[in-house]
Amino acid sequence: MSAQIQFNAKMSIQEYLAFEEKSAVKHEFAAGQAFAMAGASERHNRISGNLFAHLHAVCKASQCTPYISDMRVKIDQVIYYPDVMVACDAADRDPYLKTAPCLVVEVLSPATERIDRGEKLYNYRQIVELNAYVLISQNEIRVDVYRHSGVQWLFESYALLSDAVHLDCPKTVLSLAEIYERIEFPNTQAQVGLS
């Protein structure tokens, strides 16, 4: 997710949806307010693209569909644009927003990390169908996973390129080397995936 600019005008979710339909800029919606989303960095886009490419290949043989950055997710009176998500529920048919994703991924930035780890973590965990909420750092090799065990939410953290994240929905294994392929990190000359 990118940095946000808040509008002070309170609005209903219906007013937000009508406003968003005509807007040239994407806005997330929480607490009755629209928040404009700013652009994302090249690293952010590459990480999202790497992840989407993997999930697209995995989902081809299933009823699941991966989405990247422009599909909204609605949780009660809150609407976000996750960086990547996967929805498998055939009843979740709205062409502009989903309510039952099984996987939600946010690529962290300094401007949004607090929201992604706080407000969004709380709200996403309200989605009954959600199996995992994944947070990916774009400034270091680090992937944090909040996974629903069926009874409680568990936290896992990965920080080595040789690590792999196992997902139940869709059923796949994501290597950190694949997530960070062709990513240059600040303060190093290393670029993952190129020799």
Question: What do the PLM-derived regions correspond to, one by one?
Answer:
Residues 1-195:
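Gly/Pro/Ser/Thr-rich low-complexity, intrinsically disordered segments predominantly at protein N-termini
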